């Protein structure tokens, strides 16, 4: 059954799953991905209609004035051994300011640049420890707070038009974050990477389809976006299944055109690394398989015998892979204890 037919039918019968959350070992390489009946896409359907048409019709939504310089406001600087942490903000193309930490190694560089994106319940603080580990490898690292993390209650899902507005804003803010990195005089703009965790991994696939200055996209325990996450046949824990049918239909109409599964197939020539877990209670295995299958080549896929919180080996694998593409020293990465 095609995805568009599934979405229409889901306006009436829907089962949801719990939200993608922020989570601060044995690795096995996935076998060739076979079609899965309950997944959103099979390998054979990747890149076909309606995904291709959705991409072409909506990719412009993430455009912004890339030619204008970024006005960075520095609020505080903290010197630590071998690097400095800059507490900054920069204007969002959709209004307001984007809070961020910019972690810069001591010395002139040139350095690679890495952009980090947190999970749904997180903020720039969540990945600051990872940023401090990554800076040791010879990279300028930036971690931002998404739109929901800038609000007092941090509600990241509303099942209204606000979800669409915030997701578009997030992608623009991340693209503007690339501008911040490339404005740094000690950053080599040809050596840029992205690592996203959970929700950050789901949004990373969307970003990969529109932002090709980044060479390496590391996607840790993600799936194909919010429509995928809340509408495929999963555990009824997300709240979507309790909404009136008309409200479900309005939300699907707003969100389907910007679901990551339609964009990750356009990442090339950027490379993708999908990391997923066999016992993940938040990202169902069929959804992960569909996301992986939809991704363009070149891509790498690894599965871990863990839950949503990946083991230390996954971080080592990720940094080693990123190092090969953007020229950082992975031997200096300590990783989570």
Model regions: which residues?
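Short beta-strand/loop motif that positions the catalytic acidic residue
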Residues: 267-268, 273-276
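C-terminal catalytic histidine-bearing segment of alpha/beta-hydrolase fold enzymes
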Residues: 289-337
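Short beta-strand element of the alpha/beta-hydrolase
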Residues: 100, 110-119
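N-terminal cap/lid segment of alpha/beta-hydrolase-fold proteins
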Residues: 63-108
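Conserved alpha/beta-hydrolase "acid-adjacent" motif
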Residues: 281-287
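Gly/Ser-rich "nucleophile elbow"/oxyanion-hole loop immediately N-terminal to the catalytic nucleophile
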Residues: 158-198
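Cap/lid segment of the alpha/beta-hydrolase catalytic domain
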Residues: 121-175, 229-237
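Hydrolase active-site cap/lid region
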Residues: 203-253, 303, 313
């Amino acid at each position: 059954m095609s995805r568009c037919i599934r979405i229409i039918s889901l306006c009436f019968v829907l089962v949801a799953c719990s939200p993608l959350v922020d989570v601060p070992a044995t690795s096995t390489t996935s076998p060739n991905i076979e079609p899965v009946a309950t997944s959103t896409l099979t390998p054979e359907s990747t890149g076909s209609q309606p995904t291709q048409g959705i991409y072409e019709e909506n990719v412009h939504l993430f455009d912004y004035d890339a030619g204008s310089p970024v006005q960075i406001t520095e609020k505080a600087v903290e010197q630590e051994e071998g690097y400095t942490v800059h507490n900054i903000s920069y204007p969002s193309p959709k209004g307001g300011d984007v809070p961020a930490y910019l972690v810069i190694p001591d010395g002139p560089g040139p350095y690679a640049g890495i952009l980090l994106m947190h999970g749904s319940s997180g903020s720039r603080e969540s990945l600051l420890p990872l940023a401090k580990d990554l800076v040791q490898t010879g990279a300028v690292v930036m971690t931002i707070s998404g739109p929901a993390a800038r609000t007092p209650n941090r509600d990241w899902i509303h099942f209204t038009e606000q979800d669409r507005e915030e997701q578009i804003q997030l992608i623009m803010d991340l693209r503007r974050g690339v501008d911040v990195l490339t404005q740094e005089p000690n950053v080599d703009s040809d050596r840029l990477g992205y690592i996203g965790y959970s929700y950050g991994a789901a949004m990373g696939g969307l970003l990969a389809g529109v932002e090709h200055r980044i060479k390496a996209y590391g996607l840790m325990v993600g799936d194909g976006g919010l429509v995928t996450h809340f509408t495929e046949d999963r555990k009824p824990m997300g709240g979507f299944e309790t909404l009136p049918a008309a409200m479900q239909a309005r939300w699907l109409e707003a969100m389907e055109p910007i679901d990551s599964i339609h964009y990750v197939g356009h990442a090339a020539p950027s490379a993708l690394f999908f990391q997923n877990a066999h016992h993940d209670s938040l990202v169902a295995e069929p959804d992960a398989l569909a996301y992986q299958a939809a991704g363009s080549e070149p891509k790498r896929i690894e599965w871990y015998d863990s839950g949503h919180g990946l083991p230390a080996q996954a971080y080592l694998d990720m940094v080693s892979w990123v190092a090969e593409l953007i020229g950082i020293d992975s031997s200096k990465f300590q990783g989570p204890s």
